[in-house]
């Protein structure tokens, strides 16, 4: 297989814990680009909250909001949006089941909205500018809703009430993401392949969390980080070093010629 695209999750994968990309990794990515390999990002973050890294990487492909939005070389090629009415229903059900004080974030194509008690940028400086709202008069189409739910029974009930959505819990906390059923990273990859004229066998995908399992299984090479959850490691073709110790950079250094057939 000749690899034509390297596709990276951000948090826990391409990004170190301090939310930076190592110099070693950036150097190896540039070498790959010089050999004609495209670089892509596939993240659960909104595009808005990924801009710091998008600007640094200048990727050919950006899959954001957990697969609900796909951009190829600057042009949107796929959107899986909830209507305004559907978005209001999502918010209402979250309030009914989890309480009106539950923390919610919503991605739209242009913005990231939140009702946190604390500005998220105070906790993570890499987080892009967000728009604060109490969501009572929210009137936008949306790509993704995330809800922080500490009670497992409430989480299960909300998932049951939103059975028409794709729901994934993030492993590092109590946040659950809800998107359209069609909005997954793997489905986004299929749309991207049609536009790019490549096959999934020509993609190497890197990830660490539940939302990455499907894309690692789909792509020709699935690579799990050393810090990945066990479920991701179980489906990967390779398990490499962790995100804080140049896992990706070292993998590209040592395996590129052999596995990518360059």
What residue spans do the PLM features occupy?
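Short hydrophobic/aromatic-enriched beta-strand-loop microsegments
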Residues: 59-66, 80, 124-125, 167-170, ...
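Active-site metal-binding loops of divalent metal-dependent hydrolases
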Residues: 12, 67, 207-209
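Walker B beta-strand of ABC/ABC-like P-loop ATPase nucleotide-binding domains
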Residues: 7-8
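Residue-level signal for inorganic ion chemistry
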Residues: 32, 43, 66, 145, ...
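Short, structured coil segments at secondary-structure junctions
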Residues: 57-58, 66, 161-164, 218-219, ...
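Active-site phosphate-binding/coordination module
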Residues: 18-120
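Conserved acidic, metal-coordinating active-site core of Asp-based
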Residues: 97-206, 210-218, 227
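Mg2+-dependent phosphoryl-transfer enzymes with acidic/Ser/Thr/Gly-rich catalytic loops
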Residues: 1-4, 16, 22, 177-262
């Amino acid at each position: 297989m000749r690899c034509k695209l390297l596709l990276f999750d951000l948090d826990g994968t391409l990004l170190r814990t301090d939310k930076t990309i190592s110099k070693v990794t950036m150097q190896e990515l540039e070498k790959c680009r010089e050999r004609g390999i495209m670089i892509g990002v596939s993240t659960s973050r909104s595009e808005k909250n990924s801009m710091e890294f998008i600007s640094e990487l200048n990727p050919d492909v950006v899959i954001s909001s957990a697969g609900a939005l796909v951009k190829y070389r600057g042009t949107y090629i796929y959107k899986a949006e909830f209507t305004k009415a559907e978005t209001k229903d999502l918010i209402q059900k979250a309030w009914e089941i989890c309480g009106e004080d539950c923390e919610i974030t919503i991605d739209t194509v242009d913005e990231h909205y939140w009702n946190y008690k604390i500005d998220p940028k105070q906790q993570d400086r890499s987080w892009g500018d967000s728009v604060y709202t109490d969501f009572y008069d929210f009137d936008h189409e949306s790509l993704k809703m995330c809800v922080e739910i500490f009670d497992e029974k409430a989480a299960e009930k909300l998932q049951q009430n939103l059975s028409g959505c794709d729901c994934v819990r993030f492993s590092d906390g109590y946040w659950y993401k809800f998107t359209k059923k069609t909005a997954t990273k793997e489905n986004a990859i299929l749309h991207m392949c049609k536009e790019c004229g490549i096959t999934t066998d020509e993609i190497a995908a890197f990830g660490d969390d539940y939302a990455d399992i499907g894309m690692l299984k789909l792509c020709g090479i699935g690579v799990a980080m050393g810090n990945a959850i066990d479920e991701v490691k179980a489906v990967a073709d390779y398990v490499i070093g962790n995100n804080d110790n140049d896992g990706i950079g070292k993998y590209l250094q040592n395996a590129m010629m052999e596995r990518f057939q360059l």
